[in-house]
């Protein structure tokens, strides 16, 4: 897991480090996923268990890793139906005009949505491959050809789009497709068992709010989770 914390969040991270052990033990020992400050269940419980150091989540610097599957993965096998569906769901998320294609610019974000964290060099190589061979656009079959081997090799260490989407819905309590400051504050209260200050929440949102609207959409959430 990455442990680098962006500077606007350093002070908050320091405070959270002091309480991470207590917060994590509360999550681990609660049978129904309740923390002191409120209800914690489902995707939020999964996030908490996969990121014991809570300041990494707020960093935002946590790459969430699935545990326990590496021994069962066989890179030379075919994709399973559920893995094809995961690819399809990720592809749909970034096929914004619903024409059956995504462009090379969106491919990096799409890969991050799947939990695969490409290096800058990998993205350059993929971009060159797409522009030269695929006309700058990728249909679903091309996407499977590009991402299938990566999914087979990396899925043991990744959190997928379904888990990210489920976690996003837990934060987005009113279902409007964006996380507001109040929604993020409430999610952090549930995760940590105490209230996070308004200024700290605003700093978190400013750090990941790419379009400057003061809210976090799903694409920004994916970036937040993958830094």
Swiss-Prot record:
Q: Which domain of life is it from?
A: Eukaryota
Q: Residues with S-palmitoyl cysteine lipidation? A: 4
Show the GO cellular component annotation of the record: glutamatergic synapse; Golgi membrane; plasma membrane
The lipid modification N-myristoyl glycine is placed on 2
- Tell me the residue numbers annotated for binding Ca(2+) 2: 172, 174, 176, 178, 183
GO biological process, alphabetically ordered? modification of postsynaptic actin cytoskeleton; negative regulation of protein import into nucleus; visual perception
Mutant phenotype after disruption:
Mice exhibit a normal retinal morphology but altered light responses of retinal ganglion cells.
Extract the SUPFAM superfamilies matched here.
EF-hand (SSF47473)
Q: Where does Ca(2+) 3 bind?
A: 209, 211, 213, 215, 220
Name the Gene Ontology molecular function terms of this record: calcium ion binding; calcium-dependent protein binding; nuclear localization sequence binding
Ligand binding (Ca(2+) 1): 95, 97, 99, 101, 106
EF-hand domain boundaries: 82-117, 136-153, 159-194, 196-227
Entry-annotated residues carrying Phosphoserine = 180
- Report, as the record phrases it, the tissue specificity of this protein: Expressed in the inner retina, specifically in amacrine cells and in cone OFF-bipolar cells (at protein level).
Q: How is it modified after translation?
A: Phosphorylated. The phosphorylation regulates the activity.
- Spell out the InterPro entries in the cross-references: CaBP1/2/4/5, EF-hand-dom_pair, EF_Hand_1_Ca_BS, EF_hand_dom
| UniProtKB keywords | Calcium, Lipoprotein, Metal-binding, Myristate, Palmitate, Phosphoprotein, Repeat, Sensory transduction, Vision
Q: What is known of its domains?
A: EF-1 binds magnesium constitutively under physiological conditions, EF-3 and EF-4 bind calcium cooperatively and EF-2 binds neither calcium nor magnesium.
Oligomer status and interactors = Homodimer; when bound to calcium or magnesium. Interacts (via C-terminus) with ITPR1, ITPR2 and ITPR3. This binding is calcium dependent and the interaction correlates with calcium concentration. An additional calcium-independent interaction with the N-terminus of ITPR1 results in a decreased InsP(3) binding to the receptor. Interacts with CACNA1A (via C-terminal CDB motif) in the pre- and postsynaptic membranes. Interacts with CACNA1D and CACNA1C (via C-terminal C and IQ motifs).
PANTHER family (UniProt xref) = CALCIUM-BINDING PROTEIN 1, CALCIUM-BINDING PROTEIN 1-RELATED
UniProt function note: Modulates calcium-dependent activity of inositol 1,4,5-triphosphate receptors (ITPRs). Inhibits agonist-induced intracellular calcium signaling. Enhances inactivation and does not support calcium-dependent facilitation of voltage-dependent P/Q-type calcium channels. Causes calcium-dependent facilitation and inhibits inactivation of L-type calcium channels by binding to the same sites as calmodulin in the C-terminal domain of CACNA1C, but has an opposite effect on channel function. Suppresses the calcium-dependent inactivation of CACNA1D. Inhibits TRPC5 channels.
Q: What is this protein called?
A: Calcium-binding protein 1
Species = Mus musculus
The gene coding this protein: Cabp1
